[in-house]
Amino acid sequence: MKDTIRQLIQQALDQLTADGTLPAGLTPDIQVENTKDRSHGDFASNIAMMLAKPAGMKPRDLAARLVEAIPAHEQLAKVEIAGPGFLNFFQDHVWLAASLDRALADERLGVRKAGPAQRVVIDLSSPNLAKEMHVGHLRSTIIGDAVARVLEFLGDTVIRQNHVGDWGTQFGMLLAYLEEQPIDAEAELHDLEVFYRAAKKRFDESPEFADRARELVVKLQAGDPDCLRLWTRFNEISLSHCQKVYDRLGVKLSMADVMGESAYNDDLAQVVADLTAKGLLTEDNGALCVFLEEFKNAEGNPLPVIVQKAGGGYLYATTDLAAMRYRHNVLHADRVLYFVDQRQALHFQQVFEVARRAGFVPAGMELEHMGFGTMNGADGRPFKTRDGGTVKLIDLLEEAESRAYALVKERNEQRAERGEEPFDEVQLREIGRVVGIDSVKYADLSKHRTSDYSFNFELMLSFEGNTAPYLLYACTRVASVFRKLGQGREQLGGKIVLEQPQELALAAQLAQFGDLINNVALKGVPHLLCAYLYELAGLFSSFYEHCPILTAEDPAQKDSRLRLAALTGRTLEQGLELLGLKTLERM
């Protein structure tokens, strides 16, 4: 709908330019936003205020000319001027109802991509191996997964790349520690965190041990069979731990998506050679660097992008450049999204620019750093255990499930006291599992990607506010309508007719699902989908309260309201699925 309004405004601008009202050569960015108060229309634009000065007119006078010039359209009932010169657009109720009937009949809810389908590489999760995933890996994993799901829903070909840290100094450290232990020490690897901490302690305390670790890194890089065998074993155990976390979280990541740093080892020397051939490298204290004038330090000197250390070793930038080339040459990506901590923003700005200058990626290939903020504890500091240690992600999820189970068990007892049929233990465990995992994920996804946020079990498990339990309950409320009806959502007849204010408000929100999904795909911001679903659930609650469904006054009204309820249920479920959340029929 927003695209339609933009096109209509552009046609009006073209007409006013042709008749001399507007000067030639104006190319405004036409903004169309949702109104906060639907009594003032469904959409609004400030285009008249933007162009009043170049037109030499008062904003309201230009707005009046625009209203006259905007062509009639079946989707619009009227256009009005508000305040200093806003244009308010009112949807046609008959067209709106018909569009919702079409959406209900469509398995994709009438959602289509705004633009051609693309091949999109999603770089997500990417934990360092040789130790277990911790809470710091949550955001990249679930935000990347949600955006990948949205892009797939819109018809893009999505290629997930789990760029795990499976190479580097930490492996020399672990190999050296394994040398010192009894033969059965390999069994300890099943608690990777304990093993890693012990090795790190030796590395920090013993210079001889640290030297041996570095020697083993060199042997590993040279292809020593024994080192490679143990390195492979470390990675297998690490990836097995990771997969358990992914399965527990319900994210679409598997072993087939793993493309670690080591996968690019054979290309690193060639990356340096190609940068040299392009004349981009400068030697600085023995290191090979690319200096970009666009990026300077506080003294005004260009910052280096180091691609080879003085000792010959390679860095993250070198591996990232090799990965970009692979993603162009082999994966044929049109767009690459990097879900990596916001603190790496400068790094990505630099390597993107180097990749383009070197010709590793074409100008038309989109490279986007989808940075995110930090998950903190209640004190606003990075989330830690009580003794200051790193919180394992699997432990966090287990606690979430345990807390959710206790919550739903208490509500189940209240259910029995009211004379309602209680859930059995198997059902309670499943409900607790879904509520627990969904709550952790939704609490994160509902925050703006670039913002830091404080982790709080009590808030995220609440049945009030913008939380997973609230939305899950909204889904079960819709499902209960059709259980009482004794009929499936797919068997509905009649058509949607919009009469009451609550029906119109709900319908207007449902109609915006397609625009919203396209916006999430464009910007990589799942919190917009969370906010949409929360508002949709609230509007359904108001509709449910004020517009009787099963006891409607006549069959046509009942059919219409059932269809609105069905479309709401499907939209909520589809939206939650795109966020990577499970839903429940009853809770």
Swiss-Prot record:
Known catalytic reactions: tRNA(Arg) + L-arginine + ATP = L-arginyl-tRNA(Arg) + AMP + diphosphate
One Pfam assignment: DALR_1
EC numbers: 6.1.1.19
Cross-referenced CDD domains: ArgRS_core
Main location, first listed in the record: cytoplasm
InterPro entries (alphabetical): aa-tRNA-synth_I_CS, Arg-tRNA-ligase, Arg-tRNA-synth_N, Arg-tRNA-synth_N_sf, ArgRS_core, DALR_anticod-bd, Rossmann-like_a/b/a_fold, tRNAsynth_Ia_anticodon-bd
Keyword Ligase: yes
Keyword Nuclease included in the entry's annotation: no
Cell compartments where the protein resides: Cytoplasm
Keyword terms of this UniProt record: Aminoacyl-tRNA synthetase, ATP-binding, Cytoplasm, Ligase, Nucleotide-binding, Protein biosynthesis
SMART domains in the cross-refs: Arg_tRNA_synt_N, DALR_1
Motif ('HIGH' region): 127-137
Signal peptide: none
Gene Ontology CC terms, in alphabetical order: cytoplasm
Listed GO MF terms: arginine-tRNA ligase activity; ATP binding
Record family assignment: Belongs to the class-I aminoacyl-tRNA synthetase family.
HAMAP family in the record: Arg_tRNA_synth
Assembly and binders: Monomer.
Protein name from the UniProt record: Arginine--tRNA ligase
Gene: argS
